[in-house]
Structures are given as structure tokens and as C-alpha cells.
């Protein structure tokens, strides 16, 4: 008997500044605690991807973003659900960032990614973007 897993649509912002990318660390109480990811979150019913990105980045970092083109998509199965992760090239419209709904945030060069434990879906996206996976 096959059971279908719930599909969760997630969007994330790829924000680059001076060759470094903004990543956030999940809170200790979150699903996949303390793992790193590109900033973003779930798309709510009735929202566009751009609206969800603006809402999620504001909620997590207190920052406004301009959502650009879709640059990557991966579908990653977890035990009880599947994450469809859409990565968008975005532009930060705010200079100041605050760790509001994240444990921490960092600007990393792509060569530093392997020094941080990322969520499986984000890791698959990074591998696809960097041509590693």
C-alpha cells in the first residue's frame, strides 16, 4: 500500500553581497533544529511566491526584499512529507538585519558552505546551483 506524502511548497531567497550569500540558522525548537538554510519559508494559501518571500524574510530577519527570477527548484522527500523548494534570486532592500525568528544569520562565500550543516533540501539546491550534485 502506497501512502502519498503531503507536498509543502517552500520559497527561499538567494541574496548575494560581495560574493557572499545570506544564510540563516533554524531555531533549536524548529523542525530540523539548528540547521542552516537560505532565508524563506512556506507559501501560504492564496500567496504568490514573491509575497511569501517578502513576508518570510521580514518575519525572520526584519528585512525587505525584491524577488527576482527563479534560479533553482528541487523536490526533496522527507519521512512524512515532500518539500518543493523554489530558490529565487532576490535583492535586499534593507541594510540592517535582525535575528527575529532565526537562531543566527551569516554571510558566507560558497566555498564555506561545506563548513555548515544545511537542511537536506537546501543542500540539494546548493549542489544543483554549484554543479556539484
Predicted feature locations:
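Conserved N-terminal beta-strand and adjoining loop/helix that marks the start
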Residues: 1-22, 42
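Active-site-adjacent beta-strand/loop module that shapes the phosphate/pyrophosphate-binding cleft
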Residues: 64, 74-97, 104-106
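Short secondary-structure junctions
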Residues: 60-67
Amino acid at each position: 500500500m502506497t501512502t502519498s506524502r503531503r507536498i509543502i511548497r517552500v520559497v527561499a531567497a538567494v541574496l548575494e553581497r560581495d560574493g557572499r550569500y545570506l544564510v540563516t540558522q533554524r531555531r533549536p525548537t524548529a523542525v530540523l533544529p539548528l540547521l542552516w538554510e537560505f532565508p524563506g519559508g512556506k507559501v501560504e494559501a492564496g500567496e504568490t511566491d514573491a509575497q511569501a518571500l517578502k513576508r518570510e524574510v521580514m518575519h525572520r530577519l526584519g528585512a525587505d526584499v525584491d524577488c527576482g527570477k527563479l534560479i533553482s527548484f528541487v523536490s526533496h522527500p522527507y519521512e512524512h512529507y515532500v518539500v518543493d523548494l523554489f530558490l529565487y534570486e532576490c535583492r535586499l532592500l534593507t541594510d540592517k538585519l535582525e535575528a527575529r525568528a532565526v537562531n543566527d544569520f551569516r554571510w558566507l562565500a560558497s566555498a564555506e558552505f561545506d563548513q555548515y550543516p544545511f537542511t537536506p533540501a537546501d543542500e540539494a539546491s546548493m549542489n544543483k546551483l554549484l554543479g556539484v550534485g
